[in-house]
């Protein structure tokens, strides 16, 4: 065999093998590599998206915590205000009740004083009548009575 014929035959076989490899072997390998690269890129994109979602979720958590703290502060302030208002209302009610009790006691004391005065007047009147009766029984003197009446008349004028 001739060296040139062998070389040409090897070249033909090489080109057929290269063509066969390029036509049937290389495309599935390239396709598999492209799919693998795409999966890796998708995985990296998903990881980036997950990072972004995690950062967004963390921001939302921080915001919700801030809102919850603010809301708790508002609730606490409202409760303190309501408690203060209830205390003020209770004090006002107690003051009103005390004032009513004081007024009732003063009215009762005034009524008792009035009753005592009337009872005292009645007693003084009874004593005066009794004293006058005793005086009149004891001494009936027309001249003394006339003098008394004259003195009374002068005092009244």
Curated annotation (Swiss-Prot):
What CDD domains does the record tag this protein with?
ATP-synt_Fo_b (cd06503)
Its transmembrane ranges are 7-27
Q: Which InterPro entries match?
A: ATP_synth_B-like_membr_sf, ATP_synth_b/b'su_bac/chlpt, ATP_synth_F0_bsu_bac, ATP_synthase_B_chain
Keywords in UniProt for this one?
A: ATP synthesis, Cell inner membrane, Cell membrane, CF(0), Hydrogen ion transport, Ion transport, Membrane, Transmembrane, Transmembrane helix, Transport
A GO molecular function assigned to this protein is: proton-transporting ATP synthase activity, rotational mechanism
Q: How does it sit in the membrane?
A: Single-pass membrane protein
- Compartment list: Cell inner membrane
Q: What is its main location?
A: membrane
- From which domain of life does this come? Bacteria
- One cellular component term from this protein's GO annotations in UniProt: proton-transporting ATP synthase complex
Q: Which PANTHER family match?
A: ATP SYNTHASE SUBUNIT B, ATP SYNTHASE SUBUNIT B', CHLOROPLASTIC
Q: What does this protein do?
A: F(1)F(0) ATP synthase produces ATP from ADP in the presence of a proton or sodium gradient. F-type ATPases consist of two structural domains, F(1) containing the extramembraneous catalytic core and F(0) containing the membrane proton channel, linked together by a central stalk and a peripheral stalk. During catalysis, ATP synthesis in the catalytic domain of F(1) is coupled via a rotary mechanism of the central stalk subunits to proton translocation. Component of the F(0) channel, it forms part of the peripheral stalk, linking F(1) to F(0).
Oligomeric form and interacting partners: F-type ATPases have 2 components, F(1) - the catalytic core - and F(0) - the membrane proton channel. F(1) has five subunits: alpha(3), beta(3), gamma(1), delta(1), epsilon(1). F(0) has three main subunits: a(1), b(2) and c(10-14). The alpha and beta chains form an alternating ring which encloses part of the gamma chain. F(1) is attached to F(0) by a central stalk formed by the gamma and epsilon chains, while a peripheral stalk is formed by the delta and b chains.
- Family note: Belongs to the ATPase B chain family.
- This chain belongs to the protein called ATP synthase subunit b
């Amino acid at each position: 065999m001739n060296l040139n014929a062998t070389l040409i035959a090897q070249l033909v076989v090489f080109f057929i093998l290269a063509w066969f490899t390029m036509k049937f072997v290389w495309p599935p390998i390239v396709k598999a590599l492209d799919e693998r690269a795409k999966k890796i890129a998708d995985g990296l994109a998903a990881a980036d998206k997950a990072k972004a979602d995690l950062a967004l979720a963390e921001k939302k958590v921080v915001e919700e915590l801030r809102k919850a703290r603010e809301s708790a502060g508002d609730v606490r302030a409202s409760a303190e205000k309501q408690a203060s208002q209830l205390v003020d209302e209770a004090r006002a009610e107690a003051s009103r009740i005390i004032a009513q009790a004081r007024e009732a006691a003063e009215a009762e004391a005034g009524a008792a004083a009035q009753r005592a005065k009337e009872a005292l007047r009645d007693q003084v009147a009874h004593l005066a009548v009794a004293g006058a009766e005793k005086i009149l029984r004891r001494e009936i003197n027309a001249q003394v009575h006339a003098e008394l009446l004259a003195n009374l008349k002068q005092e009244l004028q």
